[in-house]
Amino acid sequence: MTQEKGKFAEQLALNYLKENGLALVMQNYHCRLGEIDLIMREGSYLVFIEVRSRSNMNFGGGLASITYEKKQKIIKATSHYMIKYRIQDKFPIRFDVISIDGKSNKITWLKNAFDAGC
């Protein structure tokens, strides 16, 4: 995904999630261990969200494109974020995936797409 398409997809996802009651905490958290596209709050949950845009859905949607290694990077970046901001054990967490069909911009929201045990 090009950087421009990625930003567009993230903005679509952010707007969609806000419309569905989530509040933005941080966008594009980067550390040496990995990156998190969106960090949001839903009720008491801190939700770590990976945004995927696929122009060709023949090979599966967004979740199918997330490898074990990518999940591990997201989990490590999440741990880094929680330690950095001293919030470990203060919030239940969840890993979601937003999959966007690059042709129609149809959004699919996969809650609890994976867990720290992958």
Curated annotation (Swiss-Prot):
Q: Which domain of life is it from?
A: Bacteria
Family matches, as Gene3D superfamilies = 3.40.1350.10
Which Pfam family is one of this chain's hits? UPF0102
Any GO molecular function: nucleic acid binding
Q: Which family does it belong to?
A: Belongs to the UPF0102 family.
Family matches, as NCBIfam families? PRK12497.1-3, YraN family protein
Protein name per the record:
UPF0102 protein LPC_3309
What is the species listed in this Swiss-Prot or TrEMBL entry? Legionella pneumophila (strain Corby)
